[in-house]
Amino acid sequence: MPKTIRNEYYKKLSYESLMQAHLESRKGKSTRKEIIQFNLKQEEYIMWLYEQLKNRTYRHSGYTSFYVTEPKLRRIEKSIYIDRIVHRWYVDNFMQEYFVKSFSYSSFACLKGKGMHNACLYVQEMMKHCKRIWNNYYVIKMDVAKYFQNIDKQILYEILCRKIKDKNLLWLTRKILYSNGVDKGLPIGNYTSQCFANIYLNELDQYMKHKLKLKYTCRYMDDVVALVNTKKEAIEKLNLIRSFLKEKLCLELNRKTQIFQSTQGVNFCGYKINAYRLKIRDKGKRKLKKKVKFLEKQVKQGKMTCIEAHKYLSGHLGYINVANTKNLENKLFATEI
């Protein structure tokens, strides 16, 4: 795989590749009004978009903002559908091909086959291994403060420029990167933002692996776990990581960052992880039970069928199955709704 991207923009740009990006973008959303309207003239719209990108006259539109409360209060910035096609085309043809494949094996989140469940199982395997070689050891649990809001775009652009040597692709990169009109922070909701955020903290992954020589690390977006032999080593490594994040990436760790003995278990991605046990955290259990009650109410009010409710619940089965929580599963799925 080439280390840099050269003269690839126009090679990848075609009516067919943009149409494919459209087909990928609309998956699971084909009943939405904006997509129904787009589909009515999709060939015309895709050809127009192709000409815009070919002539470098494409301009990113503004965003619609709204808030979500789960898992916490966050502001989501939604771009119009045709811009989302560009995001998909950009990520699938360049980011996935040239950046994602070079990520550390211990990096998870928004990567195919490397979701939350995989990250938790990976941490558990690390803990098993460290228990065998050290018996008792220490955990460095790190969480970046307001990660998406604090990403410095100039630093991110410089990181991207190391690999992107195609001036046309750099033009589009800047169009997307600065599309929300601010120099700091990525819009939560963009398909590109997840990838950019992973590229940004890949710098930390490489630093921990090559400079600090940390063998046992796992990162799920901005949540990081590192396992070390002694408390002294944990303190030293954490101080170095703090300095690196502040000096190189203009980021800080939040107050949830801590050092503790492995016997306490690790709270990570909604699970409580020990070397030989993996449980859903109490907070996660409460949310699941709350969802069951909500579905019961929806069915009783005639807003949802029993089949739809059970289908929705089944979507959480993977989350439950990863953990050793058979009793919880039986309680939830025995509910008559």
Segments predicted by a language model, with ranges:
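Active-site-proximal segment of RNA-dependent polymerases
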Residues: K3-Y9, N93-Q149
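Short coil/turn segments at secondary-structure boundaries
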Residues: E34-F38, H60-Y67, K101-S107, N135-M142, ...
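Right-hand nucleic-acid polymerase module
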Residues: S79, R88, I235-E236, R242, ...
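Non-catalytic, polymerase-adjacent accessory regions of viral genome-replication enzymes
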Residues: M1-M47
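Amphipathic alpha-helical blocks
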Residues: F38-G62
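Active/ligand-binding-proximal structured segments within catalytic/core domains
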Residues: I85, Y90-F94
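Short, conserved non-catalytic motifs in the polymerase core
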Residues: G28-I36, S61-I85, S102-G115, I176-N198
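Conserved polymerase palm-domain catalytic core
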Residues: Y45, Q52-L53, L121-M221, V225-I241, ...
